[in-house]
Amino acid sequence: MSNSVVAKRYADALFQLGREKNSLDQLVADFLEVRQIFTNDQKLNVFLKHPKIDNEKKKQFLADVFKGADPVVINTLKLLVDRHRTSTIPSIVDHLVALVNDTKGIADATVYSIRELNTDEKEQLQTSFAKRLGKRSVQITNVVDPKILGGMKIRVGNTIYDGTVSNKLNRISRSIVSANK
């Protein structure tokens, strides 16, 4: 089974458990912290994948590191150690956050631009895309991309809205070439 399918199943189960316990926000906050640690600390990943280290030691280590977290988080981490699936943690968290945001009517958007957007520009994008997507709000992550000549490219899920100058130039070029045939 692919890691993506596995991650979605774990995220679905965690989402349902969080809803039952009315602790979705706390669960997401704890898992975001876990993801950050797993993403930034390569030594932790090496430790957890080391075949000569007993799983009980790995689970105790994780319980000590994340002792302030929700018990569901700690138990999930222990389960992932037992099943040798710790590499799926970032994907599980991403899927869980997407499920929670979808339930709350929040869309995640990545905006690629030549420069950092100011607060007013972000607010305008949030307002216009919230209406367009039928969501209550849009969380924007701004990525500065020096390859963009001007304008911006916005990615929401699998949909890309490309308003860059280079894309417009490519469209003009294609229309000129097709007109000359």
Curated annotation (Swiss-Prot):
Quaternary structure, from the entry: F-type ATPases have 2 components, F(1) - the catalytic core - and F(0) - the membrane proton channel. F(1) has five subunits: alpha(3), beta(3), gamma(1), delta(1), epsilon(1). F(0) has three main subunits: a(1), b(2) and c(10-14). The alpha and beta chains form an alternating ring which encloses part of the gamma chain. F(1) is attached to F(0) by a central stalk formed by the gamma and epsilon chains, while a peripheral stalk is formed by the delta and b chains.
Q: Which UniProt keywords apply?
A: ATP synthesis, Cell membrane, CF(1), Hydrogen ion transport, Ion transport, Membrane, Transport
GO CC annotation, single: proton-transporting ATP synthase complex
- Which family, according to UniProt? Belongs to the ATPase delta chain family.
Q: Its membrane topology, per UniProt?
A: Peripheral membrane protein
Q: What does this protein do?
A: F(1)F(0) ATP synthase produces ATP from ADP in the presence of a proton or sodium gradient. F-type ATPases consist of two structural domains, F(1) containing the extramembraneous catalytic core and F(0) containing the membrane proton channel, linked together by a central stalk and a peripheral stalk. During catalysis, ATP synthesis in the catalytic domain of F(1) is coupled via a rotary mechanism of the central stalk subunits to proton translocation. This protein is part of the stalk that links CF(0) to CF(1). It either transmits conformational changes from CF(0) to CF(1) or is implicated in proton conduction.
Q: Where in the cell is it found?
A: Cell membrane
Task: Tell me the superkingdom of the source.
Answer: Bacteria
Q: Which residues cross the membrane?
A: none
Question: GO molecular function: any one?
Answer: proton-transporting ATP synthase activity, rotational mechanism
Name the InterPro entries for this protein.
Answer: ATP_synth_OSCP/delta_N_sf (IPR026015), ATPase_OSCP/d_CS (IPR020781), ATPase_OSCP/dsu (IPR000711)
The organism named in the record is Oceanobacillus iheyensis (strain DSM 14371 / CIP 107618 / JCM 11309 / KCTC 3954 / HTE831)
**UniProt main location, coarse:** membrane
Q: Which PROSITE patterns match?
A: ATPASE_DELTA
> PANTHER family per the record?
ATP SYNTHASE DELTA CHAIN
Q: What is this protein called?
A: ATP synthase subunit delta
Keyword match Transit peptide: no
Which Pfam families does the UniProt entry name for this protein?
A: OSCP
